[in-house]
Amino acid sequence: MSSFSESALEKKLSELSNSQQSVQTLSLWLIHHRKHAGPIVSVWHRELRKAKSNRKLTFLYLANDVIQNSKRKGPEFTREFESVLVDAFSHVAREADEGCKKPLERLLNIWQERSVYGGEFIQQLKLSMEDSKSPPPKAAEEKKSLKRTFQQIQEEEDDDYPGSYSPQDPSAGPLLTEELIKALQDLENAASGDATVRQKIASLPQEVQDVSLLEKITDKEAAERLSKTVDEACLLLAEYNGRLAAELEDRRQLARMLVEYTQNQKEVLSEKEKKLEEYKQKLARVTQVRKELKSHIQSLPDLSLLPNVTGGLAPLPSAGDLFSTD
């Protein structure tokens, strides 16, 4: 069970995804560290404002899970979140995608029905959402552009394997190779290979897995000990399930990378085969020229075999001899 630190929380928030498993896993971890409720909410609020628009709603889902599931253990989170929720709702309503308004309203209705917060505070949150919905035209246009970009990205990510492949610049090959190697190396420390955690899970007492054994508990002290053990088991299993889910996504991503890498290498191979054929033809032409040149050289007369036509003749007169008066 990892200890609390702001840097650890920042890392976990950066890895938070919009899945129930991811939200519940982090929620359990936060509730376990509820004595740090103040710093937790402060980091949550800061990271919410820094998060990409498509992830902001997930931060509020996390806050909801923490607030509702921590109430029986104490009011720490309910109180701490209350101090930042007005700004958080206003910020998310203003900065997140247009489709987030209905989920936010549904969340507030649930809080009102379950009396998570008082009616006056709920109304304040609703008003903060309404007041934030009038961005300047330029900002609205930029947000729309961002939204389209995110949708395009989502459409690409929804396919486990690309149905079509667009040729890549061969110069991207080394970068893709490095990414593939890193992805393979990261999987060496995957959750499925964590023997230590698997041993901890295997060593959990039978009481945390078998409801029928609860009848054997006869005193409050034993019940409290078991409650603590069950809480720790829930956190251990939730964290491990979260890691396994992340590993599964990593392996899917690796499979996509392998498909892309294979396609890239096929294109590079095809290009190199064309180059090889081109240079084979050049070699053949140069070899033919060499052969013809050798044959031509062999057909030329050997000047060293010609007779010495100047032998026995007087040397030609010099310029001085020609103009001499003697």
UniProtKB/Swiss-Prot annotation:
InterPro entries per the record?
Answer: CID_dom, ENTH_VHS, RPRD1A/B_C, RPRD1B_CID
Look up the domain of life of the source. Answer: Eukaryota
Q: Which terms does the record give in the GO molecular function aspect?
A: identical protein binding; RNA polymerase II C-terminal domain binding; RNA polymerase II complex binding
What GO terms fall under cellular component here?
nucleoplasm; nucleus; transcription preinitiation complex
Annotated spans, Disordered: 128-148
A GO biological process held by the record: regulation of cell cycle process
Mark the residues carrying the PTM Phosphotyrosine. Answer: 161
List Phosphoserine occurrences by residue: 132, 134, 166, 299
What are the Basic and acidic residues biased-composition ranges? 128-144
Name the SMART domains for this protein: RPR (SM00582)
Entry keywords, A to Z: Acetylation, Nucleus, Phosphoprotein, Transcription, Transcription regulation
Predominant location of this chain? nucleus
Q: Which residues carry this modification: N-acetylserine?
A: 2
According to the entry, every stretch annotated as the CID domain falls at: 2-133
According to the record's subunit comment, the protein's assembly and interactions are: Homodimer. May form a heterodimer with RPRD1A. Associates with RPAP2. Associates with the RNA polymerase II complex.
What family classification does the UniProt entry report for this protein? Belongs to the UPF0400 (RTT103) family.
Q: What does this protein do?
A: Interacts with phosphorylated C-terminal heptapeptide repeat domain (CTD) of the largest RNA polymerase II subunit POLR2A, and participates in dephosphorylation of the CTD by RPAP2. Transcriptional regulator which enhances expression of CCND1. Promotes binding of RNA polymerase II to the CCDN1 promoter and to the termination region before the poly-A site but decreases its binding after the poly-A site. Prevents RNA polymerase II from reading through the 3' end termination site and may allow it to be recruited back to the promoter through promotion of the formation of a chromatin loop.
Which named protein is this? Regulation of nuclear pre-mRNA domain-containing protein 1B
Q: Top-down, what is the taxonomic lineage of the species of origin? A: Eukaryota, Metazoa, Chordata, Craniata, Vertebrata
Gene (name only): Rprd1b
